[in-house]
Amino acid sequence: MPLIYMNIMLAFTISLLGMLVYRSHLMSSLLCLEGMMLSLFIMATLMTLNTHSLLANIVPIAMLVFAACEAAVGLALLVSISNTYGLDYVHNLNLLQC
């Protein structure tokens, strides 16, 4: 396995570990999720460039579109939660609390 792939897998693993460790705040969870999506996007782009397939060129673009949609929904949720509660804790997202 080349060194660039190991670095990208390490970036994904660090982002996943950050998502597991810092899951109390929504902003840190969103940043870790963006890091995971960025590393997956770079990995998909490198795989597409190495296979020289024209049909696989749409995969990184579709991942980028989904990452942008995820970021927009996450930021809208962050603004909504912070305006309602004044904090960005993830436990405020539970709708079953009284």
UniProtKB/Swiss-Prot annotation:
Any one GO cellular component localisation term in the record: mitochondrion
Phenotype for residue 32 to R: In colorectal cancer
Membrane topology per record: Multi-pass membrane protein
Known catalytic reactions: a ubiquinone + NADH + 5 H(+)(in) = a ubiquinol + NAD(+) + 4 H(+)(out)
Class of the enzyme per the UniProt entry, highest EC level: translocase
Functional note: Core subunit of the mitochondrial membrane respiratory chain NADH dehydrogenase (Complex I) which catalyzes electron transfer from NADH through the respiratory chain, using ubiquinone as an electron acceptor. Part of the enzyme membrane arm which is embedded in the lipid bilayer and involved in proton translocation.
Assembly notes: Core subunit of respiratory chain NADH dehydrogenase (Complex I) which is composed of 45 different subunits.
Disorder named in the UniProt entry: Leber hereditary optic neuropathy: A maternally inherited form of Leber hereditary optic neuropathy, a mitochondrial disease resulting in bilateral painless loss of central vision due to selective degeneration of the retinal ganglion cells and their axons. The disorder shows incomplete penetrance and male predominance. Cardiac conduction defects and neurological defects have also been described in some LHON patients. LHON results from primary mitochondrial DNA mutations affecting the respiratory chain complexes.
Protein name: NADH-ubiquinone oxidoreductase chain 4L
Species the sequence originates in: Homo sapiens
Classification lineage: Eukaryota, Metazoa, Chordata, Craniata, Vertebrata
